[in-house]
Amino acid sequence: MADGEDIQPLVCDNGTGMVKAGFAGDDAPRAVFPSIVGRPRHTGVMVGMGQKDAYVGDEAQSKRGIITLKYPIEHGIVSNWDDMRIWHHTFYNELRASPEEHPVLLTEAPLNPKANREKMTQIMIETFNVPAMYVAIQAVLSLYASGRTTGIVLDSGDGVSHTVPIYEGYALPHAILRLDLAGRDLTDGLMKILTEKSICHYTTAEREIVRDMKEKLAYVALDYEQELETAKRRSAVEKNYELPDGQVITIGAERFRCPQVLFQPSMIGMESAGIHETTYNSIMKCDVDIRKDLYGNIVLSGGSTMFPGIADRMSKEITALAPSSMKIKVVAPPERKYSDLWIGGSILASLSTFQQMWISKGEYDESGPSIVHRKCLLAG
């Protein structure tokens, strides 16, 4: 890699809901677009429109009435490799870069199956002819972006949540916990509440409207039961929301009922621990000597940790679970919605000490895709 130090690596973070991509060394991603691929429902329907066999991202979103939308990444893990033309779109259309000229840093969900990591490596080197690549765990990058190398990351995005303890830059795989509860479930839960109360009726195509409502109006109550009582007595929690057709609806207790599901999954019929207990359980799976460092560095990451009030509530809940003498600190970086882990990737790929960690094409040719498990150690 020594000869290519003036070439900026590409950093691509593929989330369940959004792709964030750009150049290492930049302080924000150049491209942020939905992780969706759409294919025409009927060939020939779009005559005269220069019909493509597939549309990606915002273009797919805008044509959603006449194409079938697919999310190739489910619960943070690639489930449909045919639809990963998202990478082609990212490099050539969004970044206007030739991947054969740039090293590429990809991100992956914690506990990503080994076969998936190998497939990502193979596609990058054999299909895109990249000179070098690396796969890093998303939560590790979020921690780097917060200026830490030790801590526990609660990463909750659109499709999945994880708690990932990290010690001196390395994820501790035995203590990573996954929770199949995230933003999409909260949006669906809010749709259900609104429909039950006949506030409005939605189909999947209009899920985007409810997602927007959730992002603009939902918040986490410090004390859920007390907030319910307050909502019954006073209209202070009520807010108006204007639908695209101009109709105005009022939502009250739904604003904090929606994200309460993160702490109480039983509200939507899920038998699992909430995000606070999952964080605590992850810490308890770690060596007793490092727990203090983890309790003092709980870092929130991902769009589903953006609700006002979530950091205070996490702090309160974990304080109740932890030993009484333990100092608890919950950190909520302001850029965590889209770009914190992308920034972590940008920092990592720019470090001079990282340059010998890339998997080069030569190493791949010698060892095959399994080299990813030997070289990508920061990926847990």
Curated annotation (Swiss-Prot):
Enzyme class: hydrolase
Broad class of where this protein is predominantly found: cytoplasm
Record keywords: ATP-binding, Cytoplasm, Cytoskeleton, Hydrolase, Nucleotide-binding
InterPro entries cross-referenced by the UniProt entry: Actin, Actin/actin-like_CS, Actin_CS, ATPase_NBD
Gene Ontology molecular function: ATP binding; hydrolase activity
Enzyme Commission number, as recorded: 3.6.4.-
Nucleotide-binding recorded as keyword: yes
Record GO cellular component, one term: cytoplasm
Annotated catalysed reactions: ATP + H2O = ADP + phosphate + H(+)
Compartments in which it is found: Cytoplasm, Cytoskeleton
Alphabetical list of SUPFAM superfamilies matching this protein: Actin-like ATPase domain
UniProt cross-references to Pfam families, sorted A to Z: Actin
Function noted in UniProt: Actins are highly conserved proteins that are involved in various types of cell motility and are ubiquitously expressed in all eukaryotic cells. Essential component of cell cytoskeleton; plays an important role in cytoplasmic streaming, cell shape determination, cell division, organelle movement and extension growth.
Homology family: Belongs to the actin family.
Descriptive protein name: Actin-1
Organism this protein belongs to: Daucus carota (Wild carrot)
